[in-house]
Regions:
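Acidic, metal/ion-coordinating pockets
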Residues: 2-274
Length: 274
């Protein structure tokens, strides 16, 4: 029986087989709102999606391209009986096998409680980042705010952000909830970016879970000197055939589940995307 996965690809620029040392190719794959979508769905006579097909495509790209990064923009949890039964532990083990290079949290990552989420974060073999979730009493972040991935001499920085909707869920936790706060996303991006000189990183990506319209608002408020190159979003399950550009910043989402994946094919020239 044939198995296939619908792959939605977003490409920027043309790939070149040979590039000078100044120019380097980078393939950036991204998913969001997987929601425990592990199994393929039968459509007509074909099986579409499923984590095994998604993994197969990612591995295929890793074998074909020299520099590949795979990022997940929140809501890995919820949506399946298996995920609910094991409260995300089974899901994070499957995500470990899928092998993302970086992920941020979504609102459904807190469905099983903040303490449980912190345990899940320790179970992950990949970095889970968030810059704007804080402990209200001492001002400490709950997660590392960013991750710089070094690949073939390039430094790619990801900054994680989450929607304020998560507060509605955390406030239900009588013991921990009142001590959790969500800071302004723009302010947190500025804090991270101001800590780096422009030459410190080659590409800066916001990995958000705040929704497409909020991504547009966020992009409009970002200062040019912060050097944000793109926003990879989630939360609203938005399908985009082409990036939405606001304030010179491309914004993308890859819908929902495992039946599609976003893809950027980039040529990096120090600070510029060609």
């Amino acid at each position: 029986m044939k198995r296939r996965i619908k792959i939605g690809e977003i490409k920027m620029g043309k790939k070149k087989d040979k590039t000078k040392e100044r120019y380097k190719n980078l393939t950036l794959l991204h998913s969001n709102d997987l929601h425990g979508d592990f199994l393929a769905e039968k459509i007509n006579k074909d099986l579409v999606g499923g984590v095994s097909m998604l993994s197969g495509y990612i591995n295929k790209v890793r074998n074909e391209e020299q520099n590949v990064i795979y990022a997940i923009s929140g809501d890995m949890f919820r949506g399946s009986v298996i995920d609910s039964e094991y409260k995300g532990i089974s899901t994070i083990e499957i995500m470990n096998l899928l092998g993302p290079d970086v992920a941020t949290i979504g609102n459904h990552e807190v469905d099983y409680g903040i303490a449980h989420l912190l345990f899940i974060e320790k179970c992950a073999t990949f970095p889970i980042i968030n810059a704007n979730m804080y402990i209200a009493t001492n001002g400490n972040r709950l997660f590392r705010p960013y991750k710089i991935i070094k690949i073939n001499g390039m430094k790619i920085m990801f900054i994680g952000l989450i929607t304020e909707m998560v507060l509605a869920r955390t406030k239900l936790e009588s013991m921990i909830g009142p001590f959790i706060d969500i800071n302004d996303a723009v302010e947190e991006v500025g804090k991270v970016c101001n800590a780096y000189k422009p030459d410190d990183v080659d590409l800066t990506v916001l990995l958000t879970h705040i929704g497409f319209e909020e991504d547009r608002v966020l992009a409009s408020k970002l200062k040019p000197e912060w050097g944000i190159n793109m926003i990879i979003g989630g939360h609203t399950h938005t399908f985009l055939d082409e990036p939405e550009v606001v304030n010179g910043i491309p914004i993308v989402q890859a819908g929902i589940g495992t039946s599609q994946i976003g893809r950027f094919d980039l040529i990096i020239d120090t600070k510029k995307i060609k």
